[in-house]
Structure formats: C-alpha cells, structure tokens
C-alpha cells in the first residue's frame, strides 16, 4: 500500500509532463485571445456550496463527493468541479462590481469517488472557463467557439457538438409534468436511480446511462415543445451565431448534463474514437447559480474540459508534437581532481541560461560520454587533467563530432556563442 498510489489516482511522470504543459499552454494561449483571465481557487470548499450549487439530487452530490469534517467540526468537500468555486470567489471578492463580463478560466485537479476506467479517475484535471454578467446568446456562442478552437488547435477532427436548451424556471414545470406523465407507466421497470429521481428531478431521467432507460428516454416529450418565448429566442439566437461562425452542430433534445444549475443553453463536445468516454467537454448556462449561493442575480455560462480525456484523444491519434528535452552542455570530468572546476563552470554556464548537466558519480570518461548521449547533449565540455594543466578544456560538438581545445577562461563566452548558433 505504501508504494502504490490510491485507486483512481495516477502519477504524472517526468516523461509525461511535457505533454501536459503543451496542453495547458495551448489552453492558456487561446484563452488570452478571447480575453479570459486565470483564477485559482482552493481544492476544498464548504460542503454547503456544492449541495446548493450543484444540486442535492445529482449523482455528484449523492454518490461521488469526498467530504470530511475538520477539527473545527466544519464539513468540507474536495471540489468535484470548479464552477461553484469560481462563482463563490466572484461573490466573495465582489467581482460583480467590475464592468461585465467577468471572463475567467481555471486549470486544476478535481475529485470524485467514481469507478476508475480509461480517461476517468478519482483525482482528475479540468480546464474550464466561466463568463459572468451577460444574458444574451452571443456569449454562449463565444464560449462554445473557444472550446472548439482549443480542440481543433490540438489537431482533433470529427468532433461532434451537441446543443440543447434546458429551459428556465418559467418553462420547466410544464416539461416536468409531461416527463412524469410519460415515464410513470414504466417506472417499475426503470433503474433505482431513475425511480428516486422521478419525483425530485424528472429531467435527470433523460441523462440515465442504463441502456433500457436510454431507450425509454429517446421517446420522451421534448423540452422544445415547452420552451417559453424567451428561451426559444435565446436558443434560436445561439444556433444562428454558430451557423454564422461555420460551426457544425446537432440539436439533442435529451442533452441535459449532470448538474442541476443549468438553464437555457446546454452543450457537449464528443470525440467518438474514445468510445464510452467520448465526451471531452461539456457546459452550459447557469443564470440562477450566483443568486442561489447568496450573490446578486447574475447570468453566467461556462464549460469544463477533461484534460485526461483530451490527452487520451490526442495521444491516440499521434497528435503530440516532438518535445525537445535535450540539454546544451554536459561537463565531463574524468576522475575527481577537477570536480570543483567542473562544478564552477557548470554553474557559470547555467547563469547564462544554458541547460547544463555534469557527473556526480565520478564515473569513467566512457560512462560520462554515454550519459551525455542519453541526455542528447549538444556539446560536451571535457576537463581532463592534462588539458586543465595547460589551462585548456576540450569542447566537442556532439552533432558533428568535432573537437577543439579552448582556454578555460573563455569557456562561458565561447559556449554561449556556440549554443546560440545551434538554436
């Protein structure tokens, strides 16, 4: 147990970190193009925030949260998602006093007690954006375009964008009645989760993963028939903007997402080659959430992207670029006589911005040269006893195998020029 990571968690090893940094860099760069600024929130919050924000009838709250009581008898929860945390920060720090919209993005670990499988972990990472303070469908379209642009920039093709309107408190009661009327005769044959949701939140019956219940849901009354004029106009406006932007989409009237705070727009981006875990991004509008947690009535929309799933997708298609993990200089010091000199020269080169390694183990010249090759060093600086006695060092260009003697006092200036010309 001591040498095994907890089930559902995974080490990100040095050989994998470069891919994560590439993914994060792409996300940050595109967020900057759209004017979104990074926010960093605590990894745990008061449990009440998620109960009220996400909804007590959701799977996340009922089954998946990591909740604990601290020494002050406070109930705290590791964040299962970050929208609730972002809007809590928005209220606490009075960001609503700033000119709208407030445009935020985040990258970080989330925690859910879920069944681990490919692309799904108990500690997982999400990238997400939130836009607060704008009611119209134009910001919905921008959010969706941002998500699509990130995935396309990473090289993913054949993405499937699904959109829907889940209505608002004015039009959902009618849809709720129609759903209960439709599902009531079949309730006995549905799964236990659906039976418990029937009275509390029948909209969630459309989100069930049970194959039998999915077949039933396919014939359920569409929310489109129940939308109020405001929601209809909003949804038509969104579709018009997506069409104008040249973004393909399909309307899926059973798309409701798994969190209770969504209103009006809901969307999901799928990447079919991932199979059962094909959803790489999902989000929607949450116009009542900020008011629900104690802030002023403020419209909002956002999405979250599962970073493990996105990495799985781009790795499966060999879309990761080649990363240059080479070093500039390896300092070879046969024997221990000149170790202090080697250490001093390595430090001087690093202070000039070069990536430098040298041998700590007093290995043979041959072993040190092998290590330089393994590290893909561009140059090797050899501080042999005979050369040092003459006030010189040997500089070897590893790509051409050319060797030259250089004065010790000129090592830094010569290598600085050589490394810059090599780039």
Model-derived features: positions:
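TRNA-recognition modules of translation machinery and tRNA-sensing kinases, especially anticodon-binding
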Residues: 1-423
């Amino acid at each position: 147990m001591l040498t095994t990571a907890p089930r559902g968690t995974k080490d990100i090893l040095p050989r994998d970190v470069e891919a994560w940094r590439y993914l994060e860099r792409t996300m940050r760069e595109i967020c900057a193009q759209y004017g979104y600024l990074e926010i960093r929130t605590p990894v745990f919050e008061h449990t009440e925030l998620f109960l009220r924000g996400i909804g007590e009838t959701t799977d996340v709250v009922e089954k998946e949260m990591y909740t604990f009581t601290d020494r002050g008898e406070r109930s705290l929860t590791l964040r299962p998602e970050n929208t609730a945390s972002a809007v809590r920060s928005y209220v606490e720090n009075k960001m609503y006093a700033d000119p709208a919209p407030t445009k935020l993005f985040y990258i970080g670990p989330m925690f859910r007690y879920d069944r681990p499988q490919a692309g799904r972990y108990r500690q997982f990472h999400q990238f997400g954006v939130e836009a607060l303070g704008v009611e119209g469908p134009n910001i919905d379209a921008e959010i969706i375009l941002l998500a699509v642009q990130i995935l396309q920039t990473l090289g993913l093709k054949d993405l499937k964008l699904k959109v829907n309107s889940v209505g608002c408190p004015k039009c959902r009661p009618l849809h709720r009645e129609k759903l209960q009327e439709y599902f009531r005769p079949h309730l006995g044959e549905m799964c236990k989760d659906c039976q418990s949701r029937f009275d509390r939140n029948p909209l969630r019956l459309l989100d069930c993963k049970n194959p039998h219940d999915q077949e039933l849901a396919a014939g359920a009354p569409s929310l489109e028939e129940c939308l109020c004029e405001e929601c209809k106009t909003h949804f038509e406006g969104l579709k018009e903007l997506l069409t104008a932007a040249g973004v393909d989409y399909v309307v899926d009237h059973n798309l409701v997402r798994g969190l209770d705070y969504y209103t009006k727009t809901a969307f999901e981006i799928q990447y079919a080659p991932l199979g059962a875990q094909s959803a790489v991004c999902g989000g929607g509008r949450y116009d009542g959430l900020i008011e629900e947690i104690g802030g002023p009535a403020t419209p909002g929309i956002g999405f979250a992207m599962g970073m493990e799933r996105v990495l799985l997708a781009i790795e499966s298609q060999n879309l990761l670029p080649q990363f240059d993990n080479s070093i500039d200089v390896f300092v070879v010091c046969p024997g221990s006589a000149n170790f202090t000199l080697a250490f001093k020269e390595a430090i001087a080169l690093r202070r000039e911005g070069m990536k430098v390694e040298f041998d700590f183990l007093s290995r043979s010249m041959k072993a040190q040269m092998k290590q330089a090759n393994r590290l893909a060093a561009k140059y090797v600086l050899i501080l042999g006893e005979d050369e040092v006695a003459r006030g010189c060092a040997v500089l070897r260009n590893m790509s051409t195998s050319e060797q030259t003697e250089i004065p010790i006092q000129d090592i830094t200036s010569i290598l600085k020029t050589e490394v810059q010309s090599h780039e």
